[in-house]
Curated annotation (Swiss-Prot):
Belongs to the universal ribosomal protein uL10 family. PANTHER family: 60S ACIDIC RIBOSOMAL PROTEIN P0 (PTHR45699), LARGE RIBOSOMAL SUBUNIT PROTEIN UL10 (PTHR45699:SF3). Part of the 50S ribosomal subunit. Forms part of the ribosomal stalk which helps the ribosome interact with GTP-bound translation factors. Forms a heptameric L10(L12)2(L12)2(L12)2 complex, where L10 forms an elongated spine to which the L12 dimers bind in a sequential fashion. It comes from Thermoplasma acidophilum (strain ATCC 25905 / DSM 1728 / JCM 9062 / NBRC 15155 / AMRC-C165). This is Large ribosomal subunit protein uL10. The gene is rpl10. It holds the Pfam family Ribosomal_L10. Transmembrane segments: none annotated.
Length: 314
């Protein structure tokens, strides 16, 4: 017990010294991250950050030893599986590194499915045997193709929001299906007397500009709807008022210098329409004319011939 206690003291002292020597200190959540991924993160960022997985009690003890109230605030949001990240980089650079640690991975079992996990028809590469029973147990329709186990039908394996059972997690790993994305989650960062949250560090110039533009548009819309006269909306309000006034003048037959052309155009259009209607009416045959035309058509061929001969001697 004394040996274990001594090891803990040495570890706390090591952490304390590491924090003292670093410009920036962060606590990150490592839940769901496997040892291999931690090693990959260390390898890719060697010389930029130092990452050490540690028990909360030992880390909190080291923070207490430093006696810095602001630094001790890092304990407030620290829970679950955590690691200490130290660096001499700027807080924003550290945050970029943390965000870049996310990778696709297969579940272990017990995780919540972020989306529907769908298994498509495929040849698995496994020979027929006990494995076929394992696939069938979890609801997969299987067969044999070219001497290998094949999944015959598309299957919604786990629905969004459901807990992924261990037996299904095992199958997903065997099929190399990686529905989860895991990485370091920033819980808090301390640098040069200032404590930063994830929400603050996630702000980018582009996001700030977009948020400001959206806020300006919303404020402008409210000012216009409430008729609040400020420089930013005055031009729009005047333009809308003119459009409404012009429409009202036209509807009320009120002629002004601004709308006289509109009245002339309207009068011209109406004249054209009236002229077309009158011309159409004048070309229509009366009932008497139609009857006379019908009588002419009813004459026999002999009558037509005699009338023609008679006309020659008139």
């Amino acid at each position: 017990m004394k040996e274990v206690s001594q090891q803990k003291k040495e570890l706390v002292n090591e952490i304390t010294q590491r924090i003292k020597a670093s410009r920036s200190v962060a606590i990150v959540d490592t839940a769901g991250i496997r040892t291999r991924q931690i090693q990959d993160i260390r390898g890719k960022n060697r010389g930029k950050i130092n990452l050490k997985v540690i028990k909360k009690t030992l880390l909190f003890k080291a923070l207490e030893n430093l006696g810095d109230e602001k630094l001790s605030k890092l304990k407030e949001n620290s829970g679950g599986q955590i690691a200490l990240l130290t660096s001499d980089l700027e807080p924003t650079e550290i945050y970029k590194i943390i965000e870049s640690t996310f990778q696709k991975t297969a579940p272990r079992g017990g995780e919540i499915a972020p989306e529907d996990i769908v298994i498509q028809p495929m040849t698995t590469g496994f020979p027929p045997g006990p494995m076929m029973t394992e696939f069938q147990k979890v609801g997969l329709q299987t067969g044999v193709e070219k001497g290998k186990i094949a999944i015959k039908k598309e299957t919604v394996f786990v629905k969004k929001g459901e807990t992924i059972p261990k037996d299904k997690a095992k199958i997903l790993e065997m099929l190399e299906i990686k529905p989860l994305e895991v990485g370091l989650q920033l819980l808090g960062l301390y640098s040069e007397g200032v404590v930063y949250s994830k929400e603050v560090l996630s702000l980018t110039p582009e996001r700030i500009a977009n948020d400001m533009a959206a806020a300006f548009s919303q404020a402008k819309a409210i000012a216009k709807s409430s008729m609040f006269f400020v420089d930013e909306v005055l031009r729009d309000l005047l333009a809308e008022a003119k459009i409404k006034a012009d429409a009202l003048a036209l509807a009320g037959q009120f002629i002004t210098e601004d709308n006289v052309k509109d009245f002339l155009v309207r009068a011209n259009v109406n004249a054209i329409i009236l002229n077309n209607v009158l011309n159409k009416g004048s070309t229509q045959e009366t009932p008497e004319e139609k009857k006379e035309e019908a009588k002419k058509e009813e004459k026999s061929p002999d009558e037509s011939i005699s009338e023609g001969l008679g006309a020659l001697f008139q």
